[in-house]
Amino acid sequence: MAEGEIEDRELEELRRKKLEELQKKAELERQAQIAAAQRRMALKRILTPEALARLDNIRIVRPELAEALEQQIIALASSGRVKVPIDDNTLKKILEAVYSQTRKEYKFRL
């Protein structure tokens, strides 16, 4: 077998693997976008416009906190533990609870 044929096969195999990786990545991104759209639709049904605006503002500043807050809101609403629609004041109370759970505490030793 010629050396060029081996290199061509190896190159083709690398291309095929790279294409598979890109396709998997694109599929994962598509699934993430679908999940985000479904969460957004659920939040629009659960939250008042003022509360939704507050959540959007939180998302700009602290995306990880907003994600935890979204999960908590959806869980509370689906279990019936909170009255829907959730107004801004109720959202603030939920935010306090979630923030206290997710807040990182830093300790410094001297």
Curated annotation (Swiss-Prot):
Keyword check for DNA-binding: yes
* Record protein name field: DNA-binding protein Pars_1791
The molecular function terms of the Gene Ontology recorded here are:
DNA binding
Family listed: Belongs to the PDCD5 family.
Annotated keywords: DNA-binding
Q: Name the source's superkingdom.
A: Archaea
Q: Which Pfam families match?
A: dsDNA_bind
GO cellular component assignments: cytosol
Record-linked InterPro entries? DNA_bind_arc, PDCD5-like, PDCD5-like_sf
Q: Which organism is it from?
A: Pyrobaculum arsenaticum (strain DSM 13514 / JCM 11321 / PZ6)
PANTHER family the UniProt entry points to: PROGRAMMED CELL DEATH PROTEIN 5
